[in-house]
Amino acid sequence: MRIPALKLPIKRGALLALANWPVVVLQFIAEATFKILLAVPIVGGTFLVALALNEDVRQVLGEDLDLRQSATGVATSLMAHPIALTSFLLAIAIVVVGGSAFMFILKGGTLAVIVDAQRHAGPLERYPVRLALLRRASRTSVDVFLDGTRRLRQRFLRLGAFLLATYLVSGLLYLTVVVAGYRAVGEEGFLVGWTVIAALCSALLVGWLTLVNTGYLILQVVMAARDVSVRMAAREALRLLRVDTARMLGVFAVTVSLVGIATLASIVATAGLGLISFVPFVGLAVLPLQLLAWLLRGLMFQYLGLTSAGAYLSLYDAPGGAPVSASIAGGVPA
């Protein structure tokens, strides 16, 4: 596989996402709203633990205020109270299902915008980046977005339900294997044996969920581009993988690498801000810097996600492109 063959779809996906930056911001706002909604039952459960069980709130929430760690801490504290634990888990389940459904519906509108941009942008990836080309690829509009949400809503909800079920089954299998490994190793080999088992299972889980999320994105792209059912989208995705295996795997490898680099940069930035917080007076600037880092991190991950979607879309629904001789304002090739 030649490098340009892989460069062009990735560049096209990046330019389509950049030209339609409002949907990137919209996806970020939707995800942030979902996380805020998810924090409500967790914070409520924390105060329930603090009041009913007389436990320290900071110990339950954890030092890093991570939602997953906080939810685990609350659930652990409520183990001795089945009714309270059931209510807490039910509240989280309601928020997860409702918030996820909201995200699934919005994703239909977002991909409808990207598909429309794909079909009107022309071969913009073959030319230097110009503002005129980005304007031509910008297809963000309320009508296109709402039409996409209405047209794809039912199918995206069905596909999303399958995704949530996959997450649930994968999580239960992970916990089962880790607990079984802990019991099999025993106290003598706890430090080494159980740690190795847990690390291996965690790595396998991350790899598996990465493949699941990639397949989920490709199915969404196919459904948005061809307006087909979930089953037909799965057939089309498999056909695309057989026909264009090298570039599909190449796009997957590049996008996963970019996400990994962005995650590493985020961790380093967070650690750096943590060190700054100990400096007198200078530490006062940490909060706005943390908010800025959170904003940039969220926008970057949403942008990478839509870049990946645009790259897969360019492989599946190749642009017809305007004639090379055609041009737009400023002498830029169309």
Residue spans of the language-model regions?
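Hydrophobic alpha-helical membrane segments
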Residues: 1-334
